């Protein structure tokens, strides 16, 4: 488990965790989902990772933040002036976060397998497909899958997917 709430915190925390947990192993596989995958890509891009399995990864945080701004009817000027704006859907929009992801784009070269739910409400298919193509990742789409894999059917699909990828 990790405690980071932002990519700049993950950039400090994740390499220490990685070195402590994985430093003696010859090969390491990372399995992460959603924002954990984004944090891993942001913080561990230079680490010795053999492969990665990402479930519903956030692959374009700037786009996600801009989408959330639209959902909350918040302009970039509003966010810049107010610095942080709580939303009705439980997220707090942050100017610092938006600036950070713009200034620190993800560069990920680890061989990666991605599982994506067809009904993911945070990342569009176009976004995930473009990312997978750009980094040479395999992309598996679960029909009727959601962002959060949690039902028995989704968890069985996830388990079968990992077995097929190995």
Per-region residue spans from a language model:
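Aromatic/hydrophobic pocket-lining residues that form π-stacking "cages" and hydrophobic walls in ligand
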Residues: 14, 40, 128
């Amino acid at each position: 488990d990790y405690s980071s709430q932002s990519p700049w915190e993950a950039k400090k925390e994740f390499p220490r965790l990685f070195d402590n947990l994985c430093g003696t192993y010859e090969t390491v596989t990372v399995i992460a989902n959603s924002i954990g995958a984004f944090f891993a890509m942001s913080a561990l891009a230079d680490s010795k990772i053999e492969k990665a399995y990402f479930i519903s990864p956030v692959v374009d945080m700037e786009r996600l933040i801009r989408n959330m701004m639209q959902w909350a009817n918040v302009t970039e000027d509003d966010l810049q002036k107010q610095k942080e704006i709580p939303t009705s859907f439980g997220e707090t929009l942050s100017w610092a976060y938006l600036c950070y992801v713009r200034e620190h784009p993800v560069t990920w070269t680890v061989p990666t397998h991605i599982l994506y739910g067809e009904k993911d409400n945070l990342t569009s298919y176009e976004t995930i497909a473009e990312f997978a193509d750009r980094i040479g990742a395999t992309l598996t789409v679960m029909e009727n899958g959601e962002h959060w894999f949690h039902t028995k059917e989704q968890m069985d699909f996830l388990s079968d997917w990992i077995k097929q990828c190995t």
